Regions:
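C-terminal effector/catalytic modules and regulatory tails appended to multi-domain proteins
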Residues: 1-64, 156, 266-271
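Conserved aromatic-histidine-acidic binding/catalytic patches
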Residues: 42, 59-70, 161, 184-188, ...
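Short amphipathic alpha-helical segments
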Residues: 46, 63-74, 165, 169, ...
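Conserved helix-loop functional segments at active or binding sites
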Residues: 56, 60, 84, 179
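Conserved ATP-binding N-box helix of the HATPase_c
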Residues: 65-103, 193-202
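Extended hydrophobic secondary-structure segments that form protein cores and membrane-embedded regions
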Residues: 76-77, 113-119, 210-212, 263-264
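ATP-lid-like helix-loop hinge signature
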Residues: 82-135, 153-154, 246-252
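Flexible, glycine-/charge-rich segments associated with ATP-binding catalytic modules
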Residues: 126-271
Length: 271
């Protein structure tokens, strides 16, 4: 059984979870790395080391350098979110397998990228965005603040048990140049997560991706993750975050509560 399943319906014990992962055997198609926040903080180890390791690993399987660069940027951004935003440890686990299309056999080989990123944070995915709303703390980001306030004004009349303010903040964390860092400016925030949507999901043959935090899940569904003129993602068929709430298939619930944030990213791509 998976480590997530074994810890269902309870708080994850970070040390036990990490120790369990240390028991796993690494193979050529399997990459596992645990990044300890305290080590980064004390020794100043840079995430460029992680980026180099990931690039070397992916290039053994994927010929498309641009796609590899996008993967590395996304995973580096998500790891950085865990370390600098949440001040918490981060676990990255990647498995690569060759797959075939039974309905349409072809000489082209495809691979399945199964990526799990977990950070062990007391704060959930959208909590820091929510804090920014409550504290009016979008300093240096007037355009972003205006767009998000417009979206909130249009969404709040549609809030319900299945789509709450917390869900709105979760979705907001993926928008272009939106950051959960304190006092971030428009210039540098949120670019990696937008690349996740624009550069990976829409360029893959098949996709199954979601982010899971608390008991809330955002599903990244083809056709609902395109960027609008503001480079925002609607999570709906209209591709309109400012005026329309996400599609009901994009926002779902789990029966179990996860303390932290888990990204499950599955891509089918040409080898």
């Amino acid at each position: 059984k998976s480590l997530i399943y074994k810890n269902k319906n309870t708080s994850l014990d970070k040390n036990k979870y990490i120790n369990d992962f240390k028991k796993f055997n690494l193979e050529l198609n399997h990459f596992t790395k645990i990044i300890i926040y305290k080590t980064i903080e004390e020794n100043g180890i840079k995430l460029s080391v992680l980026s180099t390791e990931l690039a070397c690993f992916f290039k053994n399987y994927i010929d498309d350098d641009e796609y590899v660069d996008s993967l590395v940027e996304v995973l580096g951004e998500l790891a950085d979110n865990s370390l600098s935003h949440g001040e918490s440890d981060c676990l990255i686990d990647i498995n690569i397998e060759t797959v075939y299309n039974r309905k349409n056999p072809s000489p082209n080989k495809y691979i399945s990228l199964d990526i799990v990123i977990v950070n062990f944070d007391k704060k959930l995915l959208g909590d820091r965005i929510k804090d920014k709303f409550f504290n009016n703390d979008f300093k240096g980001s007037p355009k972003t603040e205006k767009l998000l306030n417009t979206a909130l004004e249009n969404h709040k009349s549609k809030f319900s048990e299945s789509y709450t303010f917390d869900d709105f903040c979760n979705c907001a964390s993926f928008q272009w140049r939106v950051s959960s860092r304190q006092s971030s400016s428009d210039s540098f925030a949120g670019t990696g997560l937008t690349t996740l949507i624009d550069g990976l999901i829409n360029k893959s043959e098949s996709v199954y991706c979601y982010v899971y935090s608390g008991n809330k899940i955002i599903n990244f569904i083809n056709g609902m993750v395109s960027l609008d003129e503001n480079r925002f993602i609607g999570f709906n068929k209209e591709n309109d975050f400012l005026n329309k709430i996400p599609d009901k298939s994009s926002i779902t619930r789990s029966n179990y509560n996860l303390n932290g944030v888990l990204y499950n990213l599955n891509f089918i791509v040409k080898k």
